[in-house]
């Protein structure tokens, strides 16, 4: 979040709130790893696990691959237990159009064969027309073996916080 010219009371309140939450300024485009080395619930170690990303949001670890949901797509990186730095350039799994609701939540299927990625709409109420909303406001199902993707759910303004129902797995 980078504030532009503030012209309304709402704008002033929003900027003040974002500053208080330390959310003012450009994204550092990195993922920081915090480790609790002695098990006391406090992270003693801090490492930049991965940088050079594009507004990373969602993360999933499946079979030695660390998946990152960037605003412009999903990228896979090799990962081994204990790693504190990933230097591989990564392998793009799929591309998304950026802008609009930029969060990209990720969720692995229980069997680890598929990855689900939430992509928000460009606007709030389709006020820029529906053509610009194509491929948005949905959850994609990504096949990790083939790289194929299909729309799993649609009509969702900004699908964030994907999860499986713990009892049924649905």
Residue ranges and their predicted role:
Residues 1-170:
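Beta-propeller domains with acidic blade repeats across secreted/periplasmic ectodomains
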């Amino acid at each position: 979040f980078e504030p532009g010219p503030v012209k309304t009371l709402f704008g002033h309140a929003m900027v003040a709130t974002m500053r208080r939450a330390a959310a003012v300024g450009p994204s550092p485009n990195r993922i920081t790893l915090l480790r609790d080395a002695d098990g006391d619930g406090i992270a003693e170690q801090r490492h930049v696990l991965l940088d050079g990303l594009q507004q990373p949001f969602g993360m999933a670890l499946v079979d030695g691959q660390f998946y990152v949901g960037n605003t412009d797509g999903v990228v896979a990186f090799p990962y081994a237990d204990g790693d504190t730095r990933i230097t591989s350039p990564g392998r793009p799994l799929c591309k998304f159009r950026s802008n609009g609701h930029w969060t990209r939540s990720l969720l692995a299927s229980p069997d680890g064969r598929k990855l689900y990625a939430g992509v928000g709409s460009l606007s709030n109420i389709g006020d820029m027309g529906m053509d610009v909303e194509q491929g948005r406001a949905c959850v994609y199902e990504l096949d990790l073996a083939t790289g194929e993707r299909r729309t799993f759910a649609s009509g969702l303004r900004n699908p964030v916080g994907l999860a499986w129902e713990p009892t049924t797995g649905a």
